Every structure is written in C-alpha cells, then in structure tokens.
C-alpha cells in the first residue's frame, strides 16, 4: 500500500511539472511556438513621423505599439501581404521590405489612418523610399496633393523584437513531453484513487 502523504506529494509534483511544461509552450514571454507556417506573427514598434496639416509645423517622431503580421494566400503566396493592426483593431495593408526594414503603407484610396493616440500614419511614395538612410534612421518626407486634399508622405520605420520561434522538431519534443507528463498524472491519479480498492480486494 502506498502511503497517502507520499502519493499526494507525487501527484502535486507531477501536476506542477505539467503546468510548467504548458507554460513554456504557451507563454509568449518565454518561448513562442508558431502553430502554422502560413501566418507569422511578429511584434513591432513602429516609429511614425507626424505633423499638423499646415506646412510650418515641426515634424517629430513618435512611437506607436502595433502588431504586424504577414498573410499568405493563393494571390500572395510568394509576396506575403503585410497587415498592420492597431490596438483599436483597425487594420492597414502595407508592404514590408526586409532589406531595409521599412513598412510601406499601400494607399489606393485612403489618405490618413488614425491611431489610438490620435497619431496619423504618414503615407509613402517611391521618391521617399529612395531617400531613406537606414544606418542613422533618418527619413525624409514629401507632400502629395490628392483629390482629398493634402496628404503627408513619410516613412514608418519598424524595429522587430527578437523572438525565438521553435523548430518543428523542438515543438514535437515539447508536445511529447507534455502529453507524457499528462498521461503520467492521469495514470498516477487513477492508481492512487483505486489503490484502496485493490488493498481491500487483496
């Protein structure tokens, strides 16, 4: 017969092990596991140039926390579509040039995009893209007149956070460990629960 105190300690230890393993898998602050290869989640910090609508206003830099991720479908299989999502849930289509680390916002019909803090993301054209100096992160700006009025053109520079994505093999190992620990916990719990009955039958 297994001592009741010992069985309780073993069950508690196994449950703690399972919780710890699941925490490693699911906690974004420790290790992030990509659940599929078609969509890659990234956290970015976007630096946006802002200005008032009059031409004499000073330009200033502001940081806006956002999420940016890449969508792949049939049309964008080899050219992933970048989507910027703000804290308020608004989404902006963009293009991402990984060589210089800049997000380019596609602007077909919209001129201004509102952020939660009231900041407006400045839009980009080809001439501005060619004026980027990536080493010092100095960006130039231009102004473009559209049918909707003045629209400021500028660059949103993104800095990607360093986050480690586990390989398929590592994910498989973590899942196997978790399933094994969970199975051990269930079996031990059943054994300890049925142990008094076995002793009675014996």
Swiss-Prot record:
This protein's record includes keyword Methyltransferase: no
Transmembrane annotation, as ranges: 172-192
Signal peptide region: 1-20
Keywords: Glycoprotein, Membrane, Signal, Transmembrane, Transmembrane helix
Subcellular location: Membrane
Glycosylation positions in this chain: 54, 107, 112, 125
Protein name stated in the entry: Glycoprotein U22
Lineage: Viruses, Duplodnaviria, Heunggongvirae, Peploviricota, Herviviricetes
GO cellular component, one term: membrane
Topological type in the membrane: Single-pass membrane protein
């Amino acid at each position: 017969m297994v001592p009741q105190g010992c069985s309780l300690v073993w069950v508690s230890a196994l449950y703690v092990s399972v919780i710890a393993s699941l925490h490693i898998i699911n906690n974004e602050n420790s290790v992030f596991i990509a659940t599929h290869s078609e969509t890659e989640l990234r956290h970015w910090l976007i630096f946006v140039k802002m200005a008032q609508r009059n031409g004499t206003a000073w330009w200033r830099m502001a940081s806006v926390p956002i999420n940016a991720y890449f969508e792949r479908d049939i049309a964008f299989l080899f050219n992933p579509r970048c989507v910027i999502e703000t804290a308020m849930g608004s989404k902006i289509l963009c293009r991402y040039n990984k060589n210089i680390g800049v997000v380019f916002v596609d602007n077909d019909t919209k001129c201004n995009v509102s952020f939660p803090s009231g900041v407006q993301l400045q839009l980009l054209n080809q001439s501005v893209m060619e004026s980027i100096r990536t080493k010092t992160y100095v960006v130039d700006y231009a102004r473009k007149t559209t049918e909707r009025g003045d629209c400021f053109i500028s660059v949103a520079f993104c800095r990607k956070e360093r986050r480690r994505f586990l390989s398929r093999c590592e994910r498989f190992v973590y899942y196997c460990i978790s399933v094994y620990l969970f199975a051990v916990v269930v079996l031990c719990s059943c054994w300890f629960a049925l142990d008094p009955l076995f002793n009675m039958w014996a």
